[in-house]
Amino acid sequence: MNNTKKRGVLLVNLGTPEEATAPAVKRFLSQFLHDQRVVDMTRWLWCPILHGIILPIRSPKVAKLYQTVWMKEGSPLMVYSKRQQVELQAKLNCPVEIGMTYGTPSVLDGVNKLQAQGVDEICVLPLYPQYSGTTTGAAYDALAHALRKVAVVPSIQFIRDYHDHPLYIKALAESVRQSWQVQGKGDYLLCSYHGIPQRYADNGDVYPLHCEMTTELLRLELGLDKSQIGTTYQSRFGREEWLQPYTDKTLESLPAKGIKSLDVITPAFSVDCLETLEEISEQGQESFLHAGGEQYRFIPCLNDAPSHIEMMARLVTER
């Protein structure tokens, strides 16, 4: 990297509750679900629903789910994010900080820490391979809001997406092959991506196109037939139609189609978190086996794998 003494990297992810408690989860969900990028419903209608119904009911339930995946060092998302930070900083030999769109440390915290180290050019890497306004767009909003609060605005390089980057695809393929080597190869590889409302895609969000492209490139890299791999969408919320096919419904239907041994990967998540560890690894396995499946293999996120750190470094140095 050129000018490493003045250039730094800001890794941006969604964020996480600070504790696996109902109050902490409530604070986090309140900030997250207040974002109009996430829920675009009219505020006067949405806010009473959010504060009167959703937060009081969901916060204790979600807190209990977090407790099932919480690590000694804290939230999995934060633990793996910090490991990424350390590894990438060593790889690039330049300052690397973390900034979360919601919760702490915030994007502003990350910018302030970088500037305190003399950084005047920041490469912002939102760790969302596939672009969506609900994630990368929200990260950009958080960055813009943060820059309003600094005395000197640094030069910014913003990486919008990397859904088709060769090193990203190779890193995914490597994780699949490692799983096959250790656990055996299933009849089918299911690529489960976080969903968004179908209406958002209808209004121009390119997210499903990026997801489909990632799956196709992974298929080609692994040499799979189109009948051996598929794309689904998880984590839907509310009654509105979301991107389909739904992951949970697919898991319930695959055994009846003769698929008894299943591999599941979550390419849209750069680190393991509640949605991968609890929803896919635990609930997903239970659903698949209950429907008649026999073997269910969850493939962890790329996290701080060397191939993932190498890809992140390349994304930064290419700019």
Curated annotation (Swiss-Prot):
It is an enzyme of class 4 (lyase). Keywords: Cytoplasm, Heme biosynthesis, Iron, Lyase, Metal-binding, Porphyrin biosynthesis. Pathway: Porphyrin-containing compound metabolism; protoheme biosynthesis; protoheme from protoporphyrin-IX: step 1/1. It catalyses: heme b + 2 H(+) = protoporphyrin IX + Fe(2+). It comes from the Bacteria. GO terms for biological process: heme biosynthetic process. InterPro entries: Ferrochelatase (IPR001015), Ferrochelatase_AS (IPR019772), Ferrochelatase_C (IPR033644), Ferrochelatase_N (IPR033659). One of its GO terms (molecular function) is metal ion binding. One of its GO terms (cellular component) is cytoplasm. Its EC number is 4.98.1.1. Its main location: cytoplasm. PROSITE patterns: FERROCHELATASE (PS00534). Fe cation binds at H194, E275. It is found in: Cytoplasm. CDD domains: Ferrochelatase_C, Ferrochelatase_N. Belongs to the ferrochelatase family. Catalyzes the ferrous insertion into protoporphyrin IX. HAMAP family: Ferrochelatase. This is Ferrochelatase.
